[in-house]
């Protein structure tokens, strides 16, 4: 009890005190980056002594349900609401951290937390709350047709989610319903955007700026820096159109032997990459490599190429590159432009501009002194932004900010008055 007679929670006097956190995630049929981040952050919080409760669902649980039931559950899953509310009543966590609710869990859980007066933090791993496809990308181009619209009808018309109007309609109905109910602004205490760019997009989409924090993803372990003596450029990732594979190959037709290119990855555009590798001596397709070998090639590479033509969420490959001291030549677009600092930790070029990429690579090959400095600066960015220790401090600061706001609201309610 303080001098003013008001109670204080333990974390207000000791910021390192252990908290009880309920972490919520709807995992994907094919494990991806969001699933990995969910697991990493759970382990990180537990390693600092916090108690982390888990509520998880999987898309596998949707098997056998008819379309109408799936649509209803995507908008409001009453079972999730009941289960989460019972769990919160039993365990009384101090905070609920949501990673993904789509499609099985649904936004009903925000209301369960609100009824129990427990603040909610939501990590924005993608753009799903702005776009039915979650990517802001359609037909090979950035698309913002649904951005800021209460009813995202363009997405349904184009069948943006999995190429299906019916599947897209489920996500669009969820967005329209909760836009109307003002769920995003009234039932979530704070959002975590992964980059400054993503934060700006959510503000543009109508999210309250004061609730939007920025916390990037991080690496669990430090791979340690390399020396970059391999004299080659490197691409690592899925071989898909939105990753800019066409731009990459076209640029190397211009570059020729000035700087060899190694491509590590597989995917739908593998035949085009294989053909280019056979036709150009300077291009080598490595197919998909084990993690340890990819890291070693990153340590030896001169520069990483990231020519994506969509906004990206948070490309972990950039954090990994910076960790080994590898600068990045990236599209001047979306999150890539937020993370890669032009002429400090890499270079930018206009997305889709193969000639611009070729010019950036030629500049790179001709300026070894400048690029050596960029290697050191890339490593410095990793140490100050993308380590587990830095990420933990950022996460706890966000939690504490949310909890302090929650306490302030409690104290603002006069004695005997009801809390709305």
Residue ranges and their predicted role:
Residues 88, 288-289, 296-301:
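Short alpha-helical donor nucleotide-sugar binding micro-motif in glycosyltransferases
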Residues 129, 148-224:
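Donor nucleotide-sugar binding/catalytic pocket of nucleotide-sugar-dependent glycosyltransferases
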Residues 299-313, 326:
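Acidic donor-binding loop of glycosyltransferase active sites
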Residues 271-292:
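Nucleotide-activated donor-binding/catalytic signature segment of Leloir-type glycosyltransferases, i.e.
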Residues 318, 327-330, 340:
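Short hydrophobic beta-strand element within catalytic cores of glycosyltransferases
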């Amino acid at each position: 009890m303080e001098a003013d007679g008001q109670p204080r929670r333990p974390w207000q006097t000791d910021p390192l005190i252990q908290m009880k956190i309920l972490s919520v995630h709807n995992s994907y049929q094919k494990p991806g980056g969001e699933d990995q981040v969910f697991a990493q952050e759970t382990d990180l919080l537990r390693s600092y002594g916090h108690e982390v409760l888990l509520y998880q669902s999987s898309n596998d649980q949707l098997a056998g349900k008819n379309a109408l039931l799936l649509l209803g559950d995507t908008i409001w899953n009453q079972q999730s609401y009941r289960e989460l509310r019972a769990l919160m009543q039993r365990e009384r966590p101090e905070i609920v951290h949501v990673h993904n609710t789509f499609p099985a869990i649904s936004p009903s859980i925000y209301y369960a937390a609100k009824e129990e007066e427990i603040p909610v933090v939501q990590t924005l791993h993608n753009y799903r709350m702005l776009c039915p496809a979650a990517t802001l990308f359609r037909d090979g181009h950035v698309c913002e047709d649904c951005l800021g619209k209460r009813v995202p009808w363009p997405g349904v018309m184009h069948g943006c989610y999995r190429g299906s109007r019916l599947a897209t309609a489920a996500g669009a109905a969820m967005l329209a319903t909760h836009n109307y109910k003002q769920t995003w602004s009234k039932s979530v205490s704070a959002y975590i955007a992964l980059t400054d760019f993503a934060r700006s997009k959510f503000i543009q989409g109508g999210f309250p700026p004061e609730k939007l924090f920025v916390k990037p993803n991080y690496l669990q372990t430090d791979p340690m820096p390399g020396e970059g003596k391999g004299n080659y450029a490197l691409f690592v990732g899925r071989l898909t159109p939105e990753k800019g594979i066409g731009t990459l190959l076209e640029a190397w037709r211009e570059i020729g032997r000035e700087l060899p290119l190694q491509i590590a990855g597989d995917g739908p555009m593998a035949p085009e990459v294989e053909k280019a590798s056979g036709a150009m001596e300077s291009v080598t397709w490595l197919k998909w490599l084990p993690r340890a070998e990819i890291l070693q090639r990153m340590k030896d590479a001169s520069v990483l190429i990231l020519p994506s033509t969509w906004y990206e969420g948070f490309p972990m490959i950039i954090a990994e590159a910076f960790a080994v001291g590898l600068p990045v030549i990236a599209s001047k677009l979306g999150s890539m432009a937020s993370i890669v600092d032009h002429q400090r930790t890499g270079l930018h070029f206009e997305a889709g501009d193969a000639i611009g990429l070729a010019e950036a690579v030629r500049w790179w090959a001709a300026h070894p002194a400048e690029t050596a400095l960029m290697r050191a600066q890339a490593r410095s960015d990793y140490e100050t932004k993308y380590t587990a220790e830095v990420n933990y401090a950022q996460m706890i600061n966000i939690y504490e900010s949310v909890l302090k706001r929650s306490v302030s609201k409690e104290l603002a309610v006069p004695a005997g008055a009801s809390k709305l």
